[in-house]
Amino acid sequence: MLGEPRAFCRGTLRRAAWRRRLRGVRALLNRCVVFSHGKDAEPWGSKIVALAERARERGYSVESVDYRGIDSVEARLDKLLAACAALPAAPVLVGSSLGAFLAAAASRRVAASRLFLMAPAVDLPGLPTLPEMAACPTTVVHGWRDEVVPVEKGIALARAQRATLHVVNDDHRLHASLPRIVQWFDECLR
């Protein structure tokens, strides 16, 4: 008689463990990174290609929103929100320059799981005020020699969000720092 309850418990525990593993696998399959490129950049520029490769290595699916031909910040934001609405889970949002502004602006509305912002174009003339961002792990990378977005803007954003901040000896495009940026992005995905 004592053997029967144990057998039942063992079977129940095995099924529960299997369900937990299955949920974990589903969560892994649903992980997605959405890239948001800058004003004059392309959806598959060198930074995005390098970061997308690392995301795929980590088991993430990858999307890159194409804003070419769209000048309005609001229309770009709508396109990013629409891309995120189709996702099965909260995305990691990655952006560069204006794309970083868009990622930050969309983060709360799409419940982003993480933000990775490079040379974020925030608090600049002609741009709307940045809405409240998601309370999620955030990394900001900015170049000391940024000729488009003053480094102080990135520092202020990182301070306000209590984000991880990396300031590098680079310009707005951050190409010379790409190997380190890929490493920091890898840390962000863990």
Where are these regions (language model features)?
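Short, surface-exposed "cap/lid" segments of acyl-processing enzymes
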Residues: L28-G69
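Conserved alpha/beta-hydrolase "acid-adjacent" motif
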Residues: W44, E147-K153
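Gly/Ala-rich beta-loop-alpha elbow adjacent to hydrolase catalytic centers
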Residues: V94-A103
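A conserved short beta-strand
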Residues: A111-D123
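Short beta-strand/loop motif that positions the catalytic acidic residue
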Residues: A134, V140-H142, D146
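Catalytic histidine neighborhood in serine/cysteine hydrolases
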Residues: R159-R173
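Post-His helix in hydrolase/transferase enzymes
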Residues: H175-C188
